[in-house]
Amino acid sequence: MRRRKESTLMQQITPFLWFDTQAEEAANYYVSIFPNSRILKIARYGEAGPGPRDSVMTVSFEINGQQFTALNGGPQFRFSEAISFVVNCETQAEIDALWGRLSAGGKEDRCGWLKDRYGLSWQLVPTVLPELLGDKDSARAQRAMQAMLQMRKLDIAALRRAHQGSG
């Protein structure tokens, strides 16, 4: 029996974000918000178009080791809540800082969701949330869930109090 040889190549998934004309602006915005982030490459349209010659076509950027590509593709497509980026946050200070920056000019929603100024959906999730919602004591888990459903920006202390039955 032959064994399949393990591949030494590692697949990497790169989210490809379609903007109308704001790819460079959005990429600069995102790298300004998250630590360990940078612009990697900017490609421009040539004579073949479809964008104006020398205008930005794509911007490759990195957020904390995860690569993204932003495209100036025109107005045909818009972002929706069907796709969102989850940011796992250790502390309330991290949630507060990211919430303030990402929601500025955008729209806050329930349960830690927001849309940024470009319409991209984000979820700012405390790393403790799966533990609270997955508690084997269903009453505790239910209290944490009910508290979360009432929140926009998630509040770790309030979630813990609800989980314990003291809030």
Each language-model region and where it sits:
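Short, well-ordered beta-strand elements within core beta-sheets of diverse protein domains
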Residues: 15-18, 84-90
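Short N-terminal signal/transit or membrane-insertion segments
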Residues: 10-13, 56
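Short secondary-structure boundary/hinge segments and terminal tails
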Residues: 48-50, 79, 137
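Vicinal oxygen chelate
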Residues: 2-11, 40, 62, 69-73, ...
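Short, solvent-exposed loop/turn segments at the edges of secondary structure
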Residues: 56, 80-82
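Core segments of cupin and vicinal oxygen chelate
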Residues: 17-65
